[in-house]
Amino acid sequence: VYFINNVTVHNNTIEIPQTVNGGYDFSHLSLKGIVIKDEDLSNSNFAGCRLQNAIFQDCNMYKTNFNFAIMEKILFDNCILDDSYFAQIKMTDGTLNSCSAMHVQFYNATMNRANIKNTFLDYSNFYMAYMAEVNLYKVIAPYINLFRADLSFSKLDLINFKHADLSRVNLNKAILQNINLIDSKLFFTRLTNTFLEMVICTDSNMANVNFNNANLNNCHFNCSVLTKAWMFNTRLYRVNFDEASVQGMGISILRGEENIPINSDTLVTLQKFFEEDCTSHTGMSQTENNTHEVAMKITADIMQHAD
């Protein structure tokens, strides 16, 4: 059953008008359970559509317009979605599998529990997108814009975010594994309560990033800017800060556990410790002249009890 301008059409087939660019105009239709395979839908218009349990497989959907569409359990499988528009969509339990979705506009999109895997997202724009509980796996996304996006409670594995903008992104309680963030921007990014494993942030700008209560395992921040970053109650294991800029950084590594997850491979180079933390653990008050001495004393104290 299709709904066109509030008129129900019960025919098995209907004639879909064409857009001015040669595509098909499905705008504002309610489509449930449709399966479209091996079709050229480039320049088509699905704006304002309601798509439930829809499947698009092996379709060319170049420059297709899905703005303001509502999608429930939709599947894009091996489709070309380059230069398409998904602005302000509301997607629930949607999947993009083995798609090319480069230069796509997802700004202000809501994508609850989306599953994006084996997909190219180069240069795509997720500005202020809400993507809670999303699952990203084997995604190539250099130069992607995720500014102010919400990826809380999400799982990201095997992602190439090289040269990406993740500034002010909310990654609270997310899981990040095998992530390439080389030469990326993470201004004011929220990584609280986050698990990070094999995350490479070499030459990245991470000023004011928040790692409070995070767990970092085998991560690299070589030559990155971590000015005024926060790392309170943070667990570090084999984390590399070689030649990183850490002016004004605040840090309080978890102590007092039987197996503190830190070892000699960890390099903690700090310019600032909070006075209370320094005094309570070293008996020394920090001054401009003894920053290095205080840092070494705290590091030695940690290593003494480390496994």
Predicted regions and their residues:
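Tandem repeat scaffolds
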Residues: V1-M303
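Short, solvent-exposed mixed-charge patches
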Residues: H305-D307
